[in-house]
Amino acid sequence: NNEVIKTKNGGVFFYDYYSKNKNVKTHASLNHILSEMNYLYELYLATNNEDYLNMAELIKKALDETRNSWIRRDGVYRFRDDLWYAVYEGTDGSLQFKDLDYTKTLTYEDLKRASDNMLKVYGRTDETINILLESKKKFLIKEGFDIVEW
């Protein structure tokens, strides 16, 4: 199926865009993944329509399964603790996390928004979101960004 990236536990990531050539798979960037999940949680909060919640939870399930893979632990010290920009599905079905997150603080802001949405929906913060948020924050502070707490 070329329409979504499926994780082993049944979670999904939607591609950022699709090619006219059905055989070409693109990628799912973390900031798009978070924006889609946030949008679905916010639709659920506005409407109480469980279809939105169920879809948000499929994305969240994929994030839970892959959370450690998003955190950069490659040999490039400067980018240690940053988050990879995107996930790609290999021809063998494996997930490959790569590319520099050029968005600077956008992904961090999306993670803060996700944390806020989790609190509203579930009444608590979320471990996966907290781990990604803290890692991105650590990287941004090291890079000299002024991080504003919420």
Regions found by a protein language model. Give the residues of each.
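Long, well-ordered core segments of solenoidal/helical folds
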Residues: 1-9, 51-76, 119-150
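Eukaryote-skewed repeat-based solenoidal scaffolds used as protein-protein interaction platforms
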Residues: 1-67
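Carbohydrate-binding/catalytic loop surfaces
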Residues: 5-29, 72-110, 149-150
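Compositionally biased, intrinsically disordered low-complexity regions enriched in proline and serine
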Residues: 16-19, 42, 53, 89, ...
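Well-ordered alpha-helical scaffold segments within catalytic/enzyme domains
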Residues: 35-49, 91-103, 107-124
